[in-house]
């Protein structure tokens, strides 16, 4: 059932971009502004982004999902190409990953840092550096969102 809901949320044709961020955030109890901050950092909101890392791995889509997750994606019926062609899938999968890191580290900034730097104890400094950058972006995006909501 959970897989069906995940698929449904990712592929409903009328699902607008704003709804995609909000739905992913609601499903995993993550502020949509935080997801947007990560997307801004990871890809500059480029839904077609593909990047090769120093270790040879690749990151795909607006949320730069690493090919480390390829096996898991295939088990769920997805591919790396779908992360590009269906940006909402990328957003939902990223929210799912971030939620898993929050289960490991608690609902704090080290979990956000793990999204990029991973969970190795040796990567704590990198996690915190990434999290600081995301925090600044998050504050700006959240403030812009509040400002836009006041204009309505």
Curated annotation (Swiss-Prot):
Disulphide connectivity of cysteines: none
Keywords: Plasmid, Signal, Virulence
UniProt cross-references to SUPFAM superfamilies, sorted A to Z: Lysozyme-like
Effect of residue 14 to Y: In plasmid pCP301
Database matches in Pfam families: SLT
Signal as UniProt keyword: yes
Signal peptide: 1-17
Name of the protein in its database record: Protein IpgF
Organism, scientific name: Shigella flexneri
């Amino acid at each position: 059932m959970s897989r069906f809901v995940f698929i449904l949320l990712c592929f409903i044709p009328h699902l607008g971009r704003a709804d995609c961020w909000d739905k992913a955030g609601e499903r995993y109890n993550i502020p949509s502004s935080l997801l947007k901050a990560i997307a801004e950092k990871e890809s500059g909101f480029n839904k077609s982004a593909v990047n090769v890392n120093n270790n040879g791995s690749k990151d795909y889509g607006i949320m730069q999902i690493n090919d480390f997750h390829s096996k898991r994606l295939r088990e769920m019926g997805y591919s790396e190409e779908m992360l590009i062609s269906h940006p909402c899938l990328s957003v939902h999968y990223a929210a799912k990953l971030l939620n898993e890191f929050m289960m490991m580290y608690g609902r704090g900034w080290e979990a956000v840092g793990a999204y990029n730097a991973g969970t190795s104890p040796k990567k704590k400094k990198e996690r915190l550096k990434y999290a600081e950058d995301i925090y600044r972006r998050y504050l700006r995006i959240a403030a812009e969102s509040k400002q836009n909501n006041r204009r309505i």
